[in-house]
Every structure is written in structure tokens, then in C-alpha cells.
Amino acid sequence: MLRLEKLLLSAAWLVIFGVATTVIHDFDTFWQLQSGRYMIETQSIIRTDLFTLAADAPRFEHCWLHDIILYFSYTIGGYHALSVLKGLLLGGTALALLAAARVRGASWPAMLLLLAPFWLSRGGWTARPQLWTFLLFAVFLLLLERHRRRGGREVYLLFPLMILWINLHAGAVLAVPILAAYLVGEGGALALRTSNLSAHAYKTLWLATGLVLLGFLFTPYTREFIETLFSAHKLGAGQEGAPITQMFNMDWRPTSFANDPYFYYAMVVTGVLMALGWRRLSLADLCLMGGLALMGLKLSRHTSFFFFGMVAILPVYVDATADFLMARLKNRFRRIPRGLATLGAAAIFVYFALPAYETYGLFRTGLRTWHFPIEAAEFVRDHRLPRNLYNTYDWGGYLAWTLYPEYQVFWDGRQDSPEMFNYGWRVMSGHPGWESVLDKFGVKTIVSKACTVDSGQHYPLLDKLRENPRWALVFADESSLVFVRRDAVGEAWLARHRLPDERIDDTILSEALLLVQTESRRYKAWWEIARVRMARRQYPEALYALENYLMRTPTRDPLAENYYRILLPLVGEPHSSP
């Protein structure tokens, strides 16, 4: 039985590693690649927004070491190497969490069962520097749990790890609340005489904490990190005092039941397990899980750490509950429940793994090409389209990676200038004055996505450009559109390359279809499909898209409901595909 338990847990870890080692599809990867290349080629640290039209704006490149590692990996194996790096970081995170659970005395079946919540963090499984924070968070937990049980000097390893972390990602500030949870928890337990930690080991923990805080000095951006630490309470899109530059970062929003119900379910499960396993309850565990829950409620991006805490901390509570129940069974029946529990844990793990597996598969490395303006960038470069460039927010990184220094992008995912961000948002949203912003920055070429990546809605800017006689569409593919100012190119060139406006809807439709194939919850993409299909009198496909839109939209849409009532008698049953 023990061999089977270990085999199943090893297989579960391998599945996590395989699903994590998949295609690169995150937009931020490319400004990080470009930053890494620039720093290696110039042997300098980035301090201003070099790659955008706000080139003089200060830039806090907190992940500078990650950028260099990312670019170095790319030079070795291209985008395939980046996929492998992503898998190694996430696989390493899971392994460190399991090791922490084992140090705490967890059984193999309990570890397998509580590995399932690891899948709930998959919203953060992108090739970003936050993966280093995932890994180092898990390693910190492992070392702290080892110190709680063994004492010694091993806890001083947190100091070099902190120096590494502080240069890889700004998430290093999380080291402070992690250590605070253990210091408060173990300090309280010592006062109550319920701690296994000696007074000397507790003093060592304080010394290690002091060294970790000293680690904030070992970075080119010490001042910026300290400011980040003391302004953490202002983080979060929509929060009072939060920077406008967080507006489009969905994971910077406060967590709600509507956008992440599993987080709330996980908190309930955690409370129940800790109550049932009260014999193993410790003040440090309460401080840690309570703190992680508060962090998760504050920001959606922090929910992952609560799920990680479940993997490392909760297995012993499952064991405590199981031991209580098993003690009431006769000896000859005890092996059967353990075997059933192991198989049940495996089934639960598979249940949580399936959505990610169906989306990403196993070990599919490389680049999700349709997600990026690959051919559009080549078109801009090959035809030397006139500067300056405007781009939609999430494509700034890729365009900087491929077009700098010939072109500076308008903005990218690391835009730290609130003024520039405001300008970019006004244009992208088609707000009044959008054209004056383009004139202010001398924009002659626009490279735009068709649909937003979060909901799938088409960009309002496209409607403005379609109606404006000063702009012409000159390139379109499955997700990219390129427009130029008519008066900025020659008439002969424009006559050869101008495309009809109908191609805009072609691109909106094709990208919306791709978006729902990878994530069907993008409800606005279903609406875009329905809208274009209805305009083209493709009514069966339109009805199918309308049905999916109405099923997923968070608010009632009377217009869509009316269209559905009109089309249903004409078509009958909805078409089986959009």
C-alpha cells in the first residue's frame, strides 16, 4: 500500500510538471525578454521607461534578474526553453510544498488529497517573475517548518534566499508577513508553553528575520522596494489610492465570490479541517493561514498563496481527523479505509486537474502564435511604416521585443507613468479626444488586437478607426490589425495595401473564436461571435453563440435575449458550434 501511495503522489506531481510545461501565452513575457536583452547588451540596469514613448519616465524593473535569466534561457532554446523554465518553477513549488507537508509529519494519502488545491492557483501559471515568488514562498515555508521541528542554523539560509528573491520579483515583500506569522505564532505558543521550539531556536528565528530584512538592501532598487513594502495597503485596482496603472490587471482586483468562488470554498474547507483536526492545531498555523486568507481577500493575485498554504499545512489536520476515526475501527478493517481514501484522493486530484489538462495538455512547449502580433510586427518592420506607433496595452511588450530600437511602443504591461497610461486608455477605449492624443504623440501607425483577453470584447477604438477617413486598414490576420494615417504614406503604396473595412469584423470573429476555444468563460467573445454572425445572416451559428453568451454573462442583457427569442423559432435547436 505504501508503494502505491508514493507512486500515485509521484504521478500527481509529474502531471503538474507536465501541464505547467506548456506554451508561452503571457504578454508580459516579452517586455521581460526585451529588458533582459537590453541589460545584457548594454551591461546596465534599467531605470527609465526606455522602450515606450514615455522614455524619460522612471521605471522600477524589480524583476531585473528574472529578465536576464529569461533572456539567457531564450538564447539556449527559444520559446521551448521558456516553457521548460515555467514548468520547473511550478514543479519546484509543488515539490517544496509537499516536502514541507512531509516535514510536518503528513501521510502520503493526505498529501495527495491536499495537492488538489494546487490546481486552483493555475490562473497565475504564466511565464512571469511571480513564479519565482511561488517557488521561494514554498521554500521559505519548508525551511521554517524544518526549524520549528529541528532548530539549528539551517534557518539562516533564508538570508541568501532573500537576496535572490529581492532581485527576482517584488513579491519578495511577502517574506515579511510569512516570518511575522511564525514569530507571532511561536512566540505565543512559547508563552503558553505549547511550542516544540526552544527559546534558543526562537531567538535564532528572530536573528534570521533580521537578516532577511537586511536583504532589502541588496538590490539596485532598495528605495523602491521599501516604498512598495510600506504602500502595500494601497495595492489593488479600484482601491482608494491605488495607481491607475493597475486598471487592466485583473489579478490586482479584490477577490469576490463572483470572480473566485473556489477561494471562499477553500477557506471554509480549511476552517473545517483545522477544527476537526484540533489535536494538531498550532498558533503558528492559525496565524499563517489566517494571514494568507486576508491577503487573498485583499487581492485576487494573492489567492494562490492560500492554496499553497493548504498543500503544506493542512495534510496533518486530515491525518489527525483520520486517526480519530480509524481508532474506532477494528484492526482488520483499517487497511481498507486507507486504501479507499488513497484512491479517493487520487480521484479528487484528477477532477481538479482535468480542466487545466484539457486546456494546455502535457509538455506542449513553444509559443501560442495567434496570441501575439507576429506577422503584424513583420509587416510594420518590412514596410517601414511611419512612426510613431500606438499599440493596444498587452501587445506593447511583444512589439518592443521585435521592433525596438527602430520603434518605441506607446505603452506596455509595465507602464509606470500614470499620465501615459491615461492617454493610452483614452485611445484604446475610443473616448472623446482619442484622436488628439494620437496627434500629441505624432502617431502615424496603429497596431491593435481585435478583442480584449479578459472578456473577449472588441476594442472600441476599432469602431472609431472604421468611421474615421484619416485612417486606413492595411493589414489584418486572425488577431491583429494595422492602421496607418493616409497622409503619412504614399498614395500608390496605400492603393496596393489598403484593405476593406469588412476585414475588421473578420479579425474580431476569428480572435473571438480562438478566445472561447481556450477559455469558454469569456462571455463577451460569445457576444462578438453572435454579433458578426447575425450581421452575416449566419443564424444557426449566431444562435449558438447567443445561447453561450446568455449562459455566461454576469448581468442580464435584454437586447441579446430579444435576439435569441427572434432567432430560436427561425433556426430551431442551436447549431453545435459557433
Predicted features along the sequence, with ranges:
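Transmembrane-helix signature of polytopic, membrane-embedded enzymes
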Residues: 10-13, 97-119
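Membrane-interface alpha helices of multi-pass inner-membrane proteins
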Residues: 16, 117-121, 142, 155-170, ...
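Juxtamembrane membrane-water interface segments that cap and precede transmembrane helices
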Residues: 60-72, 227-265
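Transmembrane-helix motifs of polytopic, lipid-linked glycan transferases
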Residues: 84-104
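Specific aromatic-rich, kink-prone transmembrane helix
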Residues: 96, 120, 132-149, 179-187
